[in-house]
């Protein structure tokens, strides 16, 4: 079995919104990497023993007092270094170059850089040719400051009209700096540049791929738990489903999955989870039908935060009860993924991401005397999905839209009642079914229906009815931090509205939410 961690890249984070994207791109190439705070010690870097180091971007100005700097050891470790945006600027400044503050000359968005010299980083890469016969590259810029003088031993490799050092290189030391962002898709051949760095320049093998990650995870699970039994809270979501499949492959019947049906799931979701994991894959599943228990606990409660806390508390109570029945279980499995492990603004300076100990299951009892098994701890969400496909999980389950942890508990506004949940489930299923039929489901980032606790008058035949209102919500987003409402076709919305009003007895009106984020959030509660 190939060692998936044998070759690795270390990414030092200075606070850029794009830093996780760099890590995902390096992983995509097939190379393992980790994302650390910029203020790490020499001892930590030595212990990690990377084949190369990337200095990522950041919002600070290198010219400001006390702005972040790369550890000096980075430039003495004898490995290639790539500085991106702020990373290039701090590299330049620390090695004897100069950086000046941008005064109205920053570059933001699309830019074309002109190559001045050949470099190992850009070998064979060009998007166009200049009138002077030089290669041009389409890139994405996002900087105010710029390098005004490069350090000794470096050469200018690329420029723009306003940035004389858009890229620089010291080929002998294998130090490279780019003022643009190769990790974003707008930099047309950015992935090739990162591949040149990680594979050709750093000499990394490309062992980081789904099949190898699965093999490695299974071996590690076996080594960790031995012959012990393991318990897992299976929700039917992506992370817990992939953990279940990995553990099943590793330890078979020694895994017990606890599936708690809280009555707040999507239409037929409980049946689908039980059929797929129990009947089809043969996992050992304990099914707890707790709908009444959850609804009783939320009776009379309208505040969204209070509802979330109740749902979390009742889940923990039930999971604790069920885990005590599995007296031989020595390990608790969780679907913690790599972004859970990266926490903002907690380094020594408060200006970078740091690694933290993270427990993914909301508030599990502190007195649970079990070891923790987290087989997805090193993986990004897109990697988890690819592994799920490799393990045989269906595409439409792995790539469906996000669903909140409290489920319909935060999509029924105000007090949650069984009647409201049943109406919402059916209306939402129609909306999602029609999105699939119209080939629109994968064109929006998230779509769902919200139950509004208001009655509206409607006309059915010769009679009038006074029934409930639902709102359809669909958004387009890259990172879920900001979002635009999706401009779905009017005839499509009309079709969905007609079906819901005609097929779901109890709903008299359908509205469409046209709020962006900000100012609105994606979920209503």
UniProtKB/Swiss-Prot annotation:
Gene Ontology CC = cytosol
Q: Which InterPro entries match?
A: Class_I_gatase-like (IPR029062), GATASE (IPR017926), GMP_synth_C (IPR001674), GMP_synth_GATase (IPR004739), GMP_synthase (IPR022955), GMPS_ATP_PPase_dom (IPR025777), NAD/GMP_synthase (IPR022310), Rossmann-like_a/b/a_fold (IPR014729)
**For the GMPS ATP-PPase domain, which residue ranges apply?**
208-400
Q: Which Pfam families match?
A: GATase (PF00117), GMP_synt_C (PF00958), NAD_synthase (PF02540)
The alphabetized UniProt keywords are: ATP-binding, Glutamine amidotransferase, GMP biosynthesis, Ligase, Nucleotide-binding, Purine biosynthesis
EC number from the UniProt entry? 6.3.5.2
The signal peptide stretch is none
Give all residue intervals belonging to the Glutamine amidotransferase type-1 domain. 8-207
Q: Is Cell inner membrane set as a keyword in this record?
A: no
Tell me which residues bind ATP. 235-241
The positions flagged as active site in the entry are 85 (nucleophile), 181, 183
Judged by the first EC level, this protein's enzyme class is: ligase
Q: Which domain of life is it from?
A: Bacteria
Spell out the reaction equation it catalyses: XMP + L-glutamine + ATP + H2O = GMP + L-glutamate + AMP + diphosphate + 2 H(+)
Role summary? Catalyzes the synthesis of GMP from XMP.
Q: What quaternary structure, including any partners, is listed in this protein's UniProt entry?
A: Homodimer.
Q: Which HAMAP family match?
A: GMP_synthase
Q: Which PANTHER family match?
A: GMP SYNTHASE [GLUTAMINE-HYDROLYZING] (PTHR11922:SF2), GMP SYNTHASE-RELATED (PTHR11922)
Q: What is this protein called?
A: GMP synthase [glutamine-hydrolyzing]
Name the species this protein comes from. Shewanella denitrificans (strain OS217 / ATCC BAA-1090 / DSM 15013)
What gene does this protein come from? guaA
């Amino acid at each position: 079995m190939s060692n998936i961690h044998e070759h690795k890249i270390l990414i030092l984070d200075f606070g850029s919104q794009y830093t996780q994207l760099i890590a995902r791109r390096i992983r995509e190439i097939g190379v393992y990497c980790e994302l650390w705070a910029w203020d790490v010690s020499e001892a930590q870097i030595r212990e990690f023993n990377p084949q190369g180091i990337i200095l990522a971007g950041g919002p600070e100005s290198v010219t400001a007092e006390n702005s972040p700097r790369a550890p000096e050891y980075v430039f003495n470790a004898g490995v290639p270094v790539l500085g991106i945006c702020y990373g290039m600027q701090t590299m330049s400044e620390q090695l004897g170059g100069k950086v000046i503050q941008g005064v109205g000359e920053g570059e933001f968005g699309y830019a074309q850089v002109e190559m001045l010299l050949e470099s190992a980083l850009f070998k064979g890469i060009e998007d166009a040719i200049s009138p002077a016969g030089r290669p041009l590259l389409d890139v994405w810029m996002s900087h105010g400051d710029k390098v005004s003088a490069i350090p000794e031993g470096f050469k200018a490799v690329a420029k723009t009209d306003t940035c004389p050092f858009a890229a620089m290189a010291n080929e002998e030391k294998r130090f490279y700096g780019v003022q643009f962002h190769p990790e974003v898709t707008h930099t047309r051949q950015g992935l090739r540049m990162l591949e040149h760095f990680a594979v050709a320049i750093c000499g990394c093998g490309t062992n980081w791929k789904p099949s190898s990650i699965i093999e490695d995870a299974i071996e590690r699970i076996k080594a960790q738990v031995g012959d012990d039994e393991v318990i897992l809270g299976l929700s039917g979501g992506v992370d817990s489903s992939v953990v279940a499949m990995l553990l099943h492959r590793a330890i078979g019947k020694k895994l017990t999955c606890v599936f708690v049906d809280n009555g707040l799931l999507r239409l037929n979701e409980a049946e689908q989870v039980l059929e797929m994991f129990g009947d089809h894959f043969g996992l050992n599943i304990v099914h707890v039908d707790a709908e009444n228990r959850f609804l009783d606990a939320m009776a009379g409660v309208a505040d969204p935060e209070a509802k979330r806390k109740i749902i979390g508390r009742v889940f923990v109570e039930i999971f604790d009860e069920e885990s005590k029945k599995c007296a031989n279980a020595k390990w608790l499995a969780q679907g913690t993924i790599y972004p859970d492990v990266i926490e903002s603004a907690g380094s020594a300076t408060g200006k970078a991401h740091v690694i933290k100990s993270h427990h993914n299951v909301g508030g599990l009892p502190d007195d649970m005397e079990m070891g923790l098994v987290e087989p997805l701890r090193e993986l990004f969400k897109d990697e988890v999905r690819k592994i799920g496909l490799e393990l045989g999980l269906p595409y439409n389950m792995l790539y469906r839209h996000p669903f909140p942890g409290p489920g319909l508990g935060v999509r029924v506004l105000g007090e949650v009642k069984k009647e409201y949940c049943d109406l919402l489930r059916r209306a939402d299923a129609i909306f999602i079914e029609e999105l699939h039929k119209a080939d629109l489901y994968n064109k929006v980032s998230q779509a769902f229906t919200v139950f509004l606790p208001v009655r509206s008058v409607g006309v059915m035949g010769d009679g009038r009815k006074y029934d409930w209102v639902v709102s359809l919500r669909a958004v387009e987003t890259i990172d879920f931090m900001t979002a635009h409402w999706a401009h779905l076709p009017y005839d499509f919305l009309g079709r969905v509205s007609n079906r819901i009003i005609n097929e779901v007895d109890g709903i008299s009106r359908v509205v469409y939410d046209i709020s962006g984020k900000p100012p609105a959030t994606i979920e209503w509660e």
